[in-house]
Amino acid sequence: MAMSRRLVESPLVVASHNAGKVREIAELIAPFGLEARSAASLDLPEPEETGSSFVENALLKAHAAARATGLPALADDSGLAVSALGGDPGIYSARWAGPTKDFALAMATINHLLGDNPDRSAHFVCALALAWPDGHAETFEGRVDGVLVWPPRGDQGFGYDPMFLGEGAAETFGEMDPAAKHAISHRARAFALLVAACLGG
């Protein structure tokens, strides 16, 4: 197996226009002396997410940002997959919240579609793509399993966090303080793989 490329350059462009995601990634990379610059702060356009998987979409975003800035770029594509809905919303998780990013509406939609179905199992997936301006890229994927609760609980986190209760957890992702979420989340799991491969553990 080929060695992964080491990330030594800073700043790192976080190829996301989602402020919650950018903040979470900035907190995860800070201990490695890396500074995060958000795509929005660099006036980068949001590329069309035309991939058919989380990894494909993360790669699209990372390559676009690395090419535009001449800096290494980290992109995340993540979402919620609900078992009883055939894995939806999946890669369309953000789109279910509509143009105004109304996740309260998206959560209510999921709850409505589930109806009386007792199967509330779901999982979060996070794909991370780290791309360099020369076209090289590394990808990592993390997953966390759990169940959906209704009504949503907590105002920490973002997106679908308030309705997701991780396996063995007493608090939803929306109730956990950020440090607790960072320890077990799908993003943290993908990031741990990236750290081991590209930041020297």
UniProtKB/Swiss-Prot annotation:
Organism of this sequence? Rhodospirillum rubrum (strain ATCC 11170 / ATH 1.1.1 / DSM 467 / LMG 4362 / NCIMB 8255 / S1)
SUBUNIT field: Homodimer.
Residues holding Mg(2+): E48, D77
Which protein family is it in? Belongs to the HAM1 NTPase family.
Cofactor binding: number and manner:
Binds 1 Mg(2+) ion per subunit.
Q: What class of enzyme is it?
A: hydrolase
- Which is one GO molecular function term here? XTP diphosphatase activity
Give the catalytic activity. XTP + H2O = XMP + diphosphate + H(+); dITP + H2O = dIMP + diphosphate + H(+); ITP + H2O = IMP + diphosphate + H(+)
Q: What UniProt keywords apply to this chain's record, in alphabetical order?
A: Hydrolase, Magnesium, Metal-binding, Nucleotide metabolism, Nucleotide-binding
Give the matching Gene3D superfamilies: 3.90.950.10
Protein name as annotated = dITP/XTP pyrophosphatase
What does the record give as the active site? Answer: D77
Keyword Phosphoprotein in record: no
The GO cellular component terms are: cytosol
| Sequence positions that bind substrate | S16, H17, N18, A19, G20, K21, S78, F158, G159, Y160, D161, K181, H186, R187
Functional summary from the UniProt entry: Pyrophosphatase that catalyzes the hydrolysis of nucleoside triphosphates to their monophosphate derivatives, with a high preference for the non-canonical purine nucleotides XTP (xanthosine triphosphate), dITP (deoxyinosine triphosphate) and ITP. Seems to function as a house-cleaning enzyme that removes non-canonical purine nucleotides from the nucleotide pool, thus preventing their incorporation into DNA/RNA and avoiding chromosomal lesions.
Q: Which cofactor does it need?
A: Mg(2+)
Residue ranges annotated as coiled coil are none
**Per UniProt, what is one Pfam family of this protein?**
Ham1p_like
Keyword Nucleotide-binding listed = yes
EC numbers for this chain:
3.6.1.66
